[in-house]
């Protein structure tokens, strides 16, 4: 539901990333895994929200944090492919860098905050397996791949873990293709032609820098909550 997908290459690949994310979330849900909230367009039942303690003001990503607390309380989360909510992709690399650092920090912090509950019997075996795979792919793989690339550059040897990265990017390319080919009642999704797919796959490489950087920063520096609102133009300008 990205309204400014056609504005630039950067907004185009972000729109494709949103379709990729929705497809992956749907697959996780259908496979008995864990579904997550997204900040744009949540519909919450008040009793479920109150049962898990409401919103957490000590996190930079309240949607991801709330996802885990709803999960451990036994609440189910569903997915609506065509929500009546639209969003704007960020329009510059500095804004993207700031946004993705916040997403990475909040996404990683919740594992540290709720790991006892995530390992308990509150979750089904399939949900625990899903979370383990998700953590390894989204957080561990970028850190290992970055360290592997730095080591190989320093020693002038071939990276050891490059096959894993290639598999991850290939699967992402397939998910891009499937997600962007689905019908949309909202803003039109970018067409998954070969050039767009290659650019979108290359764009995913920024996570292999953001995740390691945020992981090191969280390990070295004290926890600090710095939430910076992403600037938006608004409907009138976005349509121009």
Task: Tell me what each language-model feature is.
Residues 32, 58, 67-86:
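Catalytic donor-sugar/metal-binding loop of nucleotide-sugar-dependent glycosyltransferases
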Residues 97-139:
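Active-site-adjacent helix/loop segment of glycosyltransferases
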Residues 133-222:
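Membrane-embedded multi-pass helical conduit in multi-pass membrane proteins
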Residues 99-111, 195-239:
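Membrane-proximal soluble regions of multi-pass membrane proteins
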Residues 65, 79, 84-108:
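C-terminal catalytic/acceptor-binding lobe
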